[in-house]
């Protein structure tokens, strides 16, 4: 399946034909006889997708060790994560179990990536109808880490969960946010920082959901000529750093584009939930191997003449 992902095979027949064209090498891959289309179909349906999930998680841990020292261009040593999701459309006729509209089917891939890399650290696959913010209830937040979220995750109760775990968040504020300022911090107009305020949500329900102080930063992005309003809970870091942290969120968008552009997660070799999840997790192992192999060679210690 990894071979099929990386070489864009069109189906199980195409996969079997290509593998059998190199029959002399199949033994080393664990095949004792030519590969049949039915063998691939049976494996796709019967082998639990969690096997590939565990393999991908092991590769995630390995990949992160190689990229841990990457410079994000911020004066921060904290780990910075970005959270987002992407919807993968499916045929309602072939995948009726994934229906989410009257005429459409699809699944949603909720993803958390370490922006150093970027390397995925957590992936959850759900029906496309599930709202993004519900995924936050499943996560264990790392104390001291930053979590970069778009407006779809702006829920004060969930944001309070991040803060109570000792972690930090940076998110876009919704247009209808009502915020009561308690004090203002210095601005930096040349850098784009228009305002920097500390306060609390105005509405009683929102204030009860997030009782601690919040920080609201208004930033003008000269590249897009847009005013952006951020909410965050660290009160000490520079306001410009808050904006730069959020700007790094584009890396998760690039991650999704790379996955959809280079791996097969739109065309599936099976139609069951197990087959779809198997293919997605094997696609993740392919991405992680591509991330690991180049940097692993730079970490090799070559033997000295005496050792040779």
Question: Where are each of the predicted segments found?
Answer:
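Conserved, well-structured functional cores that handle cations and Mg-NTP chemistry
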Residues: 1-245
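Short coil/turn segments at secondary-structure boundaries
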Residues: 14, 71-74, 257-262, 272
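Short, catalytically relevant binding-site loops at active-site mouths
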Residues: 176-177, 235-237, 263-266, 275-276
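Short amphipathic alpha-helical "interface-anchor" segments enriched in bulky aromatics
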Residues: 242-270
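Small-residue-rich helix-loop
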Residues: 275-284
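Amphipathic alpha-helical core segments of compact helical bundles
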Residues: 286-290, 294
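Conserved small/polar residues in nucleotide/adenosyl-binding loops
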Residues: 298-304
């Amino acid at each position: 399946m990894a071979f099929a992902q990386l070489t864009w095979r069109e189906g199980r027949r195409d996969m079997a034909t290509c593998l059998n064209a190199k029959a002399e090498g199949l033994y080393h891959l664990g095949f004792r006889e030519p590969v049949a289309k039915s063998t691939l179909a049976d494996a796709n349906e019967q082998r639990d997708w969690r096997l590939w999930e565990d393999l991908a998680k092991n590769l995630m841990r390995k990949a992160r060790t190689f990229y841990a020292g990457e410079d994000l261009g911020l004066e921060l040593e904290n780990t910075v994560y970005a959270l987002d999701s992407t919807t993968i459309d499916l045929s309602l006729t072939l995948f009726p179990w994934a229906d989410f509209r009257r005429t459409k089917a699809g699944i949603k891939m909720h993803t958390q990536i370490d922006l150093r890399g970027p390397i995925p650290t957590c992936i959850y696959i759900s029906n496309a109808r599930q709202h993004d913010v519900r995924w936050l209830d499943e996560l264990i937040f790392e104390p001291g880490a930053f979590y970069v979220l778009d407006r779809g995750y702006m829920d004060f109760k969930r944001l309070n969960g991040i803060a109570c775990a000792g972690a930090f968040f940076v998110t876009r504020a919704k247009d209808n946010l009502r915020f009561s300022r308690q004090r203002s911090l210095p601005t930096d107009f040349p850098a784009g920082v228009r305002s920097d305020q500390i306060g609390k949500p105005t509405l009683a329900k929102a204030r009860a959901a997030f009782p601690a102080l919040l920080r609201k930063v208004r930033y003008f992005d000269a590249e897009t000529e847009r005013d952006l309003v951020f909410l965050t809970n660290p009160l000490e870091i520079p306001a410009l750093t808050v904006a730069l942290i959020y700007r790094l969120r584009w890396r998760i968008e690039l991650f999704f584009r790379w996955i959809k552009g280079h791996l097969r997660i739109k065309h599936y070799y099976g139609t069951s939930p197990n087959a779809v999840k198997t293919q997605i997790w094997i696609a993740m192992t392919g991405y992680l191997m591509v991330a690991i192999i180049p940097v692993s060679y730079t970490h090799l210690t070559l033997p000295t003449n005496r050792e040779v």
